[in-house]
Regions:
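His/Asp/Glu-rich, glycine-adjacent segments
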Residues: 3-6, 10-135, 223
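Short, hydrophobic alpha-helical segments
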Residues: 158, 208-216
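Short glycine/threonine-rich loop-to-helix capping motif typified by GTGT followed
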Residues: 140-141, 175-180
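Substrate-binding rim/cap in mid-to-C-terminal beta-strand-loop elements of soluble/periplasmic
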Residues: 180-211
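A long, amphipathic alpha-helix that forms part
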Residues: 111-121, 125, 133-164
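Intrinsic disorder/low-complexity segments enriched in small, polar and charged residues
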Residues: 214, 222-223
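Short amphipathic alpha-helical segments and helix-helix/interface helices
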Residues: 41-49, 151-155, 205
Length: 223
């Protein structure tokens, strides 16, 4: 699909395995349109819940933001948040003991360590980190702060024994001289054993399903 990738269609593709931009005929963002909602009902979250996995959408939200974001027919929530809601998962408030703020941390190493601890309680913990994207659009001169923040978070997560899968729905922070998204390939990092990696966003869901099925077989979970 020609044009620059956008989060609404890109995240939907990542979470569902469906080329959402091709379905709509254009890239769309930042939030998925109502036309994409049926796809999100069959997302990674829905599959993991159906498989009996213990699942956490760890992002923390301000209650006043959630009230405004869910007021009308068009939800001003990311594909991750919409998928979590459609799978019956709560969107956690900032003060919830399981919640992680999605960036701008005072102690990024400590937040990473907490995230690693959560992975010992849940089979799958999802955290949507959007601080790099926000700064790339609005204040690119401050991007080095966010890269340092993310580095410290990852260090805390890995040093506390977390198994990491890191990817993105589009590029932009890697080209700080302009505020637009890019056509560059996005990273896909996984620290565990895995089959050959997917070639594009639509391959991420089936790839993750193979990994999770291998790690958490139903027969093993019921013994």
């Amino acid at each position: 699909m020609e044009g620059l990738p956008q989060s609404g269609t890109g995240q939907t593709a990542l979470l569902t395995g469906v080329n959402a931009a091709r379905l709509l005929g254009h890239h769309q963002g930042p939030f998925p349109s109502p036309r994409l909602r049926p796809l999100l009902k069959a997302s990674l979250y829905a599959w993991a819940k159906e498989e009996g996995l213990a699942l956490l959408h760890a992002n923390a939200y301000r209650p006043e933001y959630l009230e405004k974001a869910t007021r009308g027919r068009r939800l001003f929530l990311s594909a991750f948040a919409q998928s979590a809601r459609l799978a019956g998962l709560p969107l956690l408030p900032l003060d919830h003991p399981l919640a992680l703020p999605p960036g701008f941390w005072e102690d990024p190493y400590g937040v990473g360590a907490k995230a690693a601890a959560l992975t010992r309680r849940f089979d799958l913990v999802v955290l949507e980190y959007w601080a790099l994207d926000l700064l790339a659009h609005r204040d690119p001169e401050r991007l080095p702060e966010r890269f340092r923040e993310l580095t410290l978070f990852l260090r805390g997560f890995l040093e506390e024994g977390g198994e990491l899968l890191l990817t993105s729905d589009h590029g932009n922070a890697e080209e700080p001289w302009h505020p637009r998204h890019t056509l560059n390939p996005v990273p896909l990092v996984y620290t565990g054993e895995a089959p050959p990696p997917p070639l594009d966003l639509t391959g991420v869901l089936p790839w993750m399903q193979r990994i999770l099925t291998s790690k958490y077989k139903k027969s093993d979970r019921n013994t």
